[in-house]
Amino acid sequence: MANDKKHVIPREKYGRKRREYFHNEEREQRVQMERKARKQRAEKAEKLAKNNEERVKENLRKARIEKLTQEEIQQQQAMATKRNSSNSESEFEPSEDNALNHVSKQQPEEVSPTSDIAKDDVEVASTTNETNGYLKTNEISNDSDIDVNASTNKDRLHDDYFYSEEAQQSRVNQYIEEDNSDKVHNNIARNHKSGQTDDKSDQHRHSDQPTLIDKVKYFFKEHWAKVLIVLAVILLIVLINAIFNNVDHNGNTKDNIFQSSDNANKEKTYTDTMKSANSAIHSIVTVENDTSNNSSSAEKETQEAGKENELGSGVVYKKVGDSIFIMTNAHVVGDKKEQKITYGNNDTSIGKVIGTDKFSDIAVVKTKIKSGSDVKSIKMGDSSTLVLGEPIIVVGNPLGVDFKGSVSEGIVSGLNRHVPVDIDKDNQYDVLMSAFQMDAPVNPGNSGGGVIDKNGKLIGIASLKIDMDHVEGIAFAIPVNDAESIAKQLEAKGEVKYPNTGIKIANVKDMDEATHQSLNLPEEVNKGVVIGDVKDNSLGEKSGLQKNDVIVELDGKEVEDNLRYRQIIFSHKDDLDTLPAKIYRDGKEQDIKIKLK
């Protein structure tokens, strides 16, 4: 190749990239910083525009409210003036044509502001168009320049104009004019309707106000969360109330944590048994014929087991001033004339035995009590109306004052029972006691206690029970009708007089065969009493009874033995009637009358 020729490397053999010769790291950094600055300015401009827009809207809202208030006041004043003018014109009876003309004249005057507003809109629009044209021209000229500084000047120019007072004022005026145009049209229509009649204008004015439904909707829309909270609280209260009011009364929820003891006491239902027991305990006292204070009541009852009872209960059947009359068992009192009475809150006094009746096992004791004591007389019932299975309670002091006021429950197990009693403890029965049977538990110390019905009335005096192996729940009480009658006699006379026929008798069933044959009794006669001796001038002799007579029937009742004979005779102690009897004399049956007086 010649030396004078230029050495040229073919383009296809040129291996390096051309831009590597023109790479300027400082320029690249400057470009990135300018881009970042433009982005920040754009974000700032957007944020400022948003704030200005919100500020403009707030100003518009305030302007609207103020203008609405002024317009409303002006409207009401105008309507009041119109009503006054219409009332004055109605005296001259103006025609409908004049009224219509009057309305038509007013309408152009009211429409004129709309035309002015339209003109302003045109001016604003033209100004806006000119401004937009100016912006477009600048944008075209700026787009033609590829330099970075030119684009930056374009953004700055746009921001300066957008946030200029002229542009902001133009936008405010545009919003206000749009709002005014709508209100002017609404006022024209409202005034046109109000010019027809006063009633229609009133209805239109009321229609502008929010209705009750709108208020309710607005309230729920604004306060729906509070409403839900209130409803939830009410529902919770209702549920808790239902839990307390539906407690199981069968005892299954006794330990429920939601049930307090106070509520349980308030909700407790008193049964007839509970009422009777709480009333009767104030009429029950403890009777002891041992007035010493060396040992407890329980020890006395235990030590004297097998001996004459020294401790029992009593029922206050009468109260006169500070004195009380106590009905108890004769076997509790014994032969002593004084008894230790414990009543109320372990108060004691010494009572005097007014009288005892060993055949009926009834005794009466009188004593005085302290003032203010809660002891009261018990209500008397009627034992003749007892029904088998009737519920009863026994109130007494088993083992004395240590367990005073004890209550046991049961039913009437049997009526008209004849219970043999050994009075003198010689292992020979002396009398048949008329009693009713019950299954309520009766313990030592319950003797003389009260048997109470469901109404809290005294129907019997607990007297004895069958104490045998393999025998449970068989106790007996003296009917209150019999006990009260005996008590009144003891209170009045100190004793009870029984009729005495003056005859000595023995049981037919206890005779041997030879004696049975000597009396010439029929073989089928194996019950009754045979007369062994008749006292002179006795009721038996006056009645015509003789030795070896066999009495098999008395007062229409079969006579099984001497206990039954004595029971029938004693049952007529009050009336002393003459009783019909059937006897066998020399093997022949005869009827006879036995006198009791």
From Swiss-Prot:
Its main location: membrane. Residues 1-148, 189-208, 286-308 are annotated as: Disordered. The keyword Phosphoprotein does not apply. GO terms for cellular component: plasma membrane. The keyword Protease applies. It is found in: Cell membrane. One of its GO terms (biological process) is proteolysis. Coiled coil: none annotated. The chain crosses the membrane at residues 224-244. InterPro entries: Chloro_Bact_Ser_Proteases (IPR051201), PDZ (IPR001478), PDZ_sf (IPR036034), Peptidase_S1_PA (IPR009003), Peptidase_S1_PA_chymotrypsin (IPR043504), Peptidase_S1C (IPR001940). It is a single-pass membrane protein. Residues 485-561 form the PDZ domain. The active site is at H331, D361, S447. GO terms for molecular function: serine-type endopeptidase activity. Belongs to the peptidase S1C family. This is Serine protease HtrA-like.
